[in-house]
Amino acid sequence: MNLEQMFQQYKEQSIQGRYITLENIEPLLQKLNSNNQVSVIGKSVLEKPIYKYQIGAGETRIFLWSQMHGNESTTTKALFDFINVLNSKSDFAEKMLHTFTFYAIPILNPDGARLYTRENANKVDLNRDSQNLTQPESKVLREIFESFKPDFCFN
């Protein structure tokens, strides 16, 4: 199967458009949580949950997060397409899951997603807060980075 065929087969159809919020992804996360792979790892400024999804048992650790800027949802859609591939039970997926451990945060900035802005509810660009760590979302990202110890990170 080539990449285009995989895309057609595993594209997540339930999330479309550019406005992606927790309300859009929570049903998907509930469906994916068959083996306790989904959990809340923190809260946003407005006390919205920040979810993680973890899958795989490989030695190489890959950390992925999306919507650090709430109005940038393309990666969220791509992330769920990729999660569908990983859950496909295909030979490719099985090889990936034996090689890698994936840790994903589908929406790091749920308040920004809801307000459709790059900033969080405190009007802070989380991408500019990675050193100061003044925001709860930035702290969650750093805590997971330090505890998961990824070999590769994708934002």
What kind of feature is each model-predicted range?
Residues 43-46, 57, 70:
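Short active-site-proximal "capping" loops at secondary-structure junctions
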Residues 48-52, 113-114:
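Short, solvent-exposed polar/charged micro-motifs at secondary-structure junctions
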